[in-house]
């Protein structure tokens, strides 16, 4: 349970830090994840309220800088990532399988630094009102 809480706290801290940087930069200027990195992000379902993404990074794979709207994540595997933020700083995060996390939109470049593939499901909310319900 301690690892689960720690993983969620780390994930939310990264989301908050990159969300603050996004606000400082005056809004999203980078492409959203599916457009920027279709090799790792695929749309499984979409309607007027949410978009459900299936995400998979092989061991050692990394993305490009991209953005997310407010979202919740369900981690399907144990995973260890480095997240590079728009200002060039890097934040490490280790999250156990089964952890859940939600956060405001963010901009980052994730890299799977773990020895195994990392998989998760992300639910992106299309507007703040839906996310805040």
Indicate where each model-derived feature is located.
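Positively charged n-region of N-terminal signal peptides that target proteins for export
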Residues: 1-4
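Short acidic-glycine-tyrosine-enriched beta hairpin
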Residues: 88-105
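Bacterial N-terminal signal peptides
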Residues: 8-17
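Glycine- and acidic-residue-biased ligand/ion/polar-headgroup-sensing regions
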Residues: 68-87
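Cleaved targeting-peptide boundary
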Residues: 21-31
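Ligand-binding loop in jelly-roll beta-barrel domains
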Residues: 78, 105-128
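Short beta-strand segments in beta-sandwich/barrel cores
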Residues: 62-63, 79-84, 100
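A short glycine-rich, His/Asp/Glu-containing loop-to-beta-strand
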Residues: 37-64, 69-73, 123
